Amino acid sequence: YIPENLKATLKGSREEAEQLAGQIRDLVCSTFGHTLVLFTSYTLMGNVQQLLRDQIPFPMVQVWRNSQEEIARFKKMENAVLFAAGSCWEGVDFPGDMVSSLIIVKLPFAVPDPIHEAQREQYRSLESYIQNVVVPDMQKKLRQGFGRAIRTEQDTCVVSILDHRAAKKGKYRGDVLDALPKCQMAEKIDEVEDFIRSR
């Protein structure tokens, strides 16, 4: 599910957090909890969770860094919503129907650091570096995130991407679709609700 009505918002703005909170609330209510929400920023995760505190009728668990305790608590709860970042993109599995909705809040592009800067200097142009390094890194991490909820052909899960860059006219839509297995696509929340009801 990649919503058709995603607007580009200023990174770190209240508008960004409010738009995401609204999308997440609608998805969580459609799937009656059972949701893993993956963030690329702890700050954004905290801001969105604050906005949702009184809007979601299901228990919410937030993982800061790699808290095995919180993950174990989520796994024991019914209908819970887990907000996570960092290491939860890989290495933590939620098999079967434990997670019926996986929400990827932003495309997982690497944060620039001295290593990436050194790599960047090996390419003639920024565009070449983005296509050869940045995009493949994002695709790999996106597949890892996708794999948190869908491990086998028997697993079913709504996977939502709430980044406008993956939407219909978004800059990275083709790269996102190339990274993931072929799936039934949806752009409206009603289609998600129909899919959940049909399971």
Regions of interest found by a model, annotated:
Residues 1-199:
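ASCE RecA-like P-loop NTPase motor cores
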